[in-house]
Amino acid sequence: MCRIAGAPRTLLPLLAALLQASVEASGEIALCKTGFPEDVYSAVLSKDVHEGQPLLNVKFSNCNGKRKVQYESSEPADFKVDEDGMVYAVRSFPLSSEHAKFLIYAQDKETQEKWQVAVKLSLKPTLPEESVKESTEVEEIVFPRQLGKHSGHLQRQKRDWVIPPINLPENSRGPFPQELVRIRSDRDKNLSLRYSVTGPGADQPPTGIFIINPISGQLSVTKPLDREQIARFHLRAHAVDINGNQVENPIDIVINVIDMNDNRPEFLHQVWNGTVPEGSKPGTYVMTVTAIDADDPNALNGMLRYRILSQAPSTPSPNMFTINNETGDIITVAAGLDREKVQQYTLIIQATDMEGNPTYGLSNTATAIITVTDVNDNPPEFTAMTFYGEVPENRVDVIVANLTVTDKDQPHTPAWNAVYRISGGDPTGRFAIQTDPNSNDGLVTVVKPIDFETNRMFVLTVAAENQVPLAKGIQHPPQSTATVSVTVIDVNENPYFAPNPKIIRQEEGLHAGTMLTTFTAQDPDRYMQQNIRYTKLSDPANWLKIDPVNGQITTIAILDRESPNVKNNIYNATFLASDNGIPPMSGTGTLQIYLLDINDNAPQVLPQEAETCETPDPNSINITALDYDIDPNAGPFAFDLPLSPVNIKRNWTITRLNGDFAQLNLKIKFLEAGIYEVPIIITDSGNPPKSNISILRVKVCQCDSNGDCTDVDRIVGAGLGTGAIIAILLCIIILLILVLMFVVWMKRRDKERQAKQLLIDPEDDVRDNILKYDEEGGGEEDQDYDLSQLQQPDTVEPDAIKPVGIRRMDERPIHAEPQYPVRSAAPHPGDIGDFINEGLKAADNDPTAPPYDSLLVFDYEGSGSTAGSLSSLNSSSSGGEQDYDYLNDWGPRFKKLADMYGGGDD
């Protein structure tokens, strides 16, 4: 390869492109011959050929590029040829002389013209192992002599030997065990020695690889070694006498495993993916492929070189890419990448060790798929110069036309997506264009209503461009233009009233049959001959009617401003106008009648009921007037009393306070309590004025000093009736009964609690030798006892300090017993006298009561009791010689008692 001295590295891609252009130009001038350019294709292979292994590439010259050639092998069972001329192994086989030569046929599918070429395969020779020294002579390693005494003289020790490592090639074929070296001590002449080796590969994992003859010291290897597993072994040799005493210091032996080219390069990925933009210049980086070799990377066995075996497709040039043979970087070397023509390239990449030596190196292949990415080098183009559409008038959100464009760029990318805009013909903005994201079409849509009577047709100028600008250097205009002709279709429109609403002013009180106004509608369809008829749609008070032909509105009742259907002096009525088109359409209009007030309502007294005291002092009645008319037909008002009956003016007097209020007072000093109806004449200020006699109901009652009524009727009038009073009393009685029942229940519970304190709680009786019974039999025969001695000690001195908790009454307290004076006091309500009497009564009346000699339970009764010893407990002999074995027959409940008195062990 020649090199231009002094050329900067930045000019190398340019020089490569110029060189390629010159080569292509010269190739076009030279005469092209269709067929195989070589007579024989040869390849050097290893002995074992694997299935699918690429062997070589046969080139076929297709001058015009239009021939469709089909390849065929003369040995189809062993070899096949791909469309790009790459020869593959169909099956795995060892390479021999029968596979050394075969033919490749190429045939034109259209003309049936046929060509052939010979292929010769040769076996790769075995790499000579000059570095491995195989000698029949076994090297001897002697232990270095130590410092010691010999014949009474000191001898000088030699310096430590530097024992060179032993080089052993991997994958040796033996025979095994294979002798490596002999280890010997110079003392073996005088002593019987034993030799051994230690370390990984000997007595440590992996064990058994190296062995030594203990007598001769011969070190041997027992199996082939693999450098990729262990590249170096470090052993130590030992020499001892027959008693196991160390004779020599251990020496180190290093065994290096020499690498052989026994591993093919392996790509990190079998398929590599990369991208390159279309239109990229030569020298553009694409991707990097990487392979690894398990052999020694510092030797030729692990030094890899890359190359491109094939490129598919081969357009526009069969060498669009190149690869750096050392780094694996793939770059472009030719111009003309066009995604619209070729979207993807497939490269077969080969990695070979031995620095790429095709004779001795091992190879492997991988696939590099390079995708040509899109750039915006094609603007959108309309498929037609003019598009047509139509739309009914007054319709919005209607698609009137679909604008179609073509774009050769990659679909659904910013370089393909079209953006439409209206550049002319729509000054009022009645149309808009949206892009269909799936089809990329432009949808012309009406966004504002269109009136046929105003515009019958629109001619729009539209433009389309991509979302991103065109790439630099593209010789196309950035946008495409077209026209859209939109026809407006006339439809039957609704009639409309004008003005709407229509407001008129009329006085109230107009008689029926009065013509108010003419309320007509207009038909916007000027080019349609249609008639309009009118009907009443809404008339809350039913005061109006409309002529169906001319729209005259006439009253059918008297208009009253004070009607509840009149709001803020305005009465609303709605009318409907319908045409006879197809389909018929209608419109509504509202007539608002502003009613002017007239003095047609007499004033009334307010309030209509009042109360006052029997005497003129201390209060009066304030009154006013209510008039449904408005000014000037309302206040100020004039208040007066009628002349008859005569007692009205005799008993009452009225005083005007201002134009709206007056005050009614008693004229006499006393008026009997009761209800009186006082007529009052009220006159408004209308023209002419309107008067009215209004009745005021006055309640005269007895009053207190504050002027408030004090009779019962006032309570009733306040809203508290007899039923409510009875209900309140019943609730109070029920509440008192509940409180009383609760008090009784609490007292009864306290009494029961005091009675239960006299009994022994079964849970508190933890003694195993005494059982508590509810019935105590006949009790004591001696009935002469003092009940005062049976009172509880707590009842004698209530102020005494009581211990915390519940004290058992049937056991002696553990603290010092207080001395209580003997006194004949009346039995305390809390004593147990009643309890004993009830027990005696039950025993006398019950013939089945237990005998007197039964076990009884007594509560602790305090000291100072006058009662003697309990005869029922002393009736039996207290001697210890009695037989208590019968207690064992009483069952498990008496087991503890039987153990205590029956002479048990425990």
Curated annotation (Swiss-Prot):
Residues 863-884 are annotated as: Disordered. GO terms for biological process: adherens junction organization; calcium-dependent cell-cell adhesion via plasma membrane cell adhesion molecules; cell migration; cell morphogenesis; cell-cell adhesion; cell-cell adhesion mediated by cadherin; cell-cell junction assembly; glial cell differentiation. GO terms for molecular function: beta-catenin binding; cadherin binding; calcium ion binding. The keyword Phosphoprotein applies. Residues 160-267, 268-382, 383-497, 498-603, 604-714 form the Cadherin domain. Residues 160-724 are extracellular. Coiled coil: none annotated. Residues 746-906 are cytoplasmic. The chain crosses the membrane at residues 725-745. Residues 1-25 form the signal peptide. GO terms for cellular component: adherens junction; apical part of cell; catenin complex; cell junction; cell surface; cell-cell junction; cytoplasm; desmosome. Residues 863-880 have a biased composition (Low complexity). SUPFAM superfamilies: Cadherin-like (SSF49313). It is found in: Cell membrane; Cell membrane, Sarcolemma; Cell junction; Cell surface. Cleaved by MMP24. Ectodomain cleavage leads to the generation of a soluble 90 kDa N-terminal soluble fragment and a 45 kDa membrane-bound C-terminal fragment 1 (CTF1), which is further cleaved by gamma-secretase into a 35 kDa. Cleavage in neural stem cells by MMP24 affects CDH2-mediated anchorage of neural stem cells to ependymocytes in the adult subependymal zone, leading to modulate neural stem cell quiescence. Glycans are attached at N190, N273, N325, N402, N572, N622, N651, N692. Ca(2+) 3 binds at N261, N263, D293, N301, D353. Ca(2+) 2 binds at E170, E228, D259, M260, D262, D295. Keywords: Calcium, Cell adhesion, Cell junction, Cell membrane, Cleavage on pair of basic residues, Glycoprotein, Membrane, Metal-binding, Phosphoprotein, Repeat, Signal, Transmembrane, Transmembrane helix. It comes from the Eukaryota. Ca(2+) 1 binds at E170, D226, E228, D262. Calcium-dependent cell adhesion protein; preferentially mediates homotypic cell-cell adhesion by dimerization with a CDH2 chain from another cell. Cadherins may thus contribute to the sorting of heterogeneous cell types. Acts as a regulator of neural stem cells quiescence by mediating anchorage of neural stem cells to ependymocytes in the adult subependymal zone: upon cleavage by MMP24, CDH2-mediated anchorage is affected, leading to modulate neural stem cell quiescence. Homodimer (via extracellular region). Can also form heterodimers with other cadherins (via extracellular region). Dimerization occurs in trans, i.e. with a cadherin chain from another cell. Interacts with CDCP1. Interacts with PCDH8; this complex may also include TAOK2. The interaction with PCDH8 may lead to internalization through TAOK2/p38 MAPK pathway. Identified in a complex containing FGFR4, NCAM1, CDH2, PLCG1, FRS2, SRC, SHC1, GAP43 and CTTN. May interact with OBSCN (via protein kinase domain 2). Interacts with FBXO45. Three calcium ions are usually bound at the interface of each cadherin domain and rigidify the connections, imparting a strong curvature to the full-length ectodomain. Calcium-binding sites are occupied sequentially in the order of site 3, then site 2 and site 1. This is Cadherin-2. It comes from Callithrix jacchus (White-tufted-ear marmoset). The gene is CDH2.
